[in-house]
From Swiss-Prot:
Comment on bound cofactor: Binds 1 [2Fe-2S] cluster per subunit.
Positions with a binding annotation for FAD: 53-56, 70-72, 77-78
Domain FAD-binding FR-type: from-to ranges: 2-102
Known cofactor(s): [2Fe-2S] cluster; FAD
Similarity-based family: Belongs to the PyrK family.
Classification via InterPro entries: Cbr1-like_FAD-bd_dom, Cyt_c3_hydrogenase_gsu, Dihydroorotate_DH_ele_sf, Dihydroorotate_DH_Fe-S-bd, Dihydroorotate_DHASE_ETsu, FAD-bd_FR_type, FNR_nucleotide-bd, OxRdtase_FAD/NAD-bd
Pathway participation: Pyrimidine metabolism; UMP biosynthesis via de novo pathway; orotate from (S)-dihydroorotate (NAD(+) route): step 1/1
Protein's UniProt name: Dihydroorotate dehydrogenase B (NAD(+)), electron transfer subunit
Gene: pyrK
Keyword annotations: 2Fe-2S, Electron transport, FAD, Flavoprotein, Iron, Iron-sulfur, Metal-binding, Pyrimidine biosynthesis, Transport
Amino acid sequence: MMQKQNMIVVNQKEIAKNIYELVLQGTLVQQMNEPGQFVHIKVAEGIAPLLRRPISICNVDQEKNEFTMLYRAEGQGTKTLATRKQGEMIDVLGPLGHGFPVEEAEAGQTALLVGGGIGVPPLYELSQRLVAKGVRVIHILGFQTKDVVFYEEKFAELGDTYVATVDGTHGTKGFVTDVIDNYGIDFDILYSCGPLAMLRALEGRYKEKKAYISLEERMGCGIGACFACVCHLQEDPSGHSYKKVCSDGPVFPIGEVVL
């Protein structure tokens, strides 16, 4: 159930180039039961920046009432968020959207989790949930270069983990699909989050597989009211049928929406 709450900053640190790990605490965490959902953060008091910033939920610790977000500080809003210190309060709205269907993976099956860039974080909570129910997980994490690689060791604690960098400075040179080809990776179910180009490549390969993708789109309200994040359905690509990423998604079955 969505709630609005002022949450306390437990810790914030830069873990890779311009990539920040922010831990917040509050009872809102008790509502975070679906990996792949996101929160809307009011990065500062006042009216500038005006819009809240959508950030995916990376890790949930309901015993401590804490959750972790990872984000890239690149625009005015996220750069402001990166200045927030331990003990400060941050206005949080969430959890929002529909996440990854953990129930679609069965114990004993193999799940392939593919993340690209800042699309990697929500896969961490998902991976933990899958492992807890007896699913074997394989992770492929794609980044531009070594300086922006994060959470490789944390994912490796949960299952086989491969990294690809576009420039070849770490792991496999190239894209996540190169890792799949190089290692002949097979799986029963696919979960993915990342850039549209990556999601399109996966969709082209795995239309017949059980697969779910999380879309990264710029969102305004986060609750389906402003229509800033609509996408067409593949069954009606030029018509009036659409889905809203923020409220109908951000997770969709592969092949449902136009990428």
